[in-house]
Amino acid sequence: MTLLTRGQIEEALRRLGELAHAQDQVIELLAVGGAVMVLAYDARLATHDVDAVLLQPKLAQFLRRLVSQVADELGWPADWLNDGAKGFLMGASDGGVIFAAPGIVVNSPAPAQLLAMKLSAWRDDVDIRDAERLLRDWVGETGGDHEAIWSEIEPFIVPGQALKARYAFLDLWESVYGND
């Protein structure tokens, strides 16, 4: 499997919900990363996987079984939905529902938290493009006070990543809005 499109992600999430609903459960996820960029921002056509954190830890084993079943049904890797990005997650802000179907609700973090995660990761051109899109959508085309914006992002930076994220933010701000 290479990349998951919006349609494929929605199909898989819908199926997860069907399976949960059949057992009188509702799965609540906080999606991050590429899946949010695909589902909420239409910023990309596809992503490698769905990074999400289960908001009901008691259902973790249940969710793993369902994810495995959906993977088998679709011929996907077992880790198509995983919590690998949780190391970049500092708390859980509310950016709203980005997908819902019977048995499943998928939320996104607020833009400041998504941007904090992208700045902390800052691995490749994909992260940089995503961060630029998030910044432009959140702040607008004219910018503003970059220190005020940073103060909204900073609480979501994982300890040990602050310097990297700050430099990434300043670099991003300059490339989008200039030196002001």
State where each predicted segment sits.
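Compositionally biased terminal segments of proteins
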Residues: M1-D180
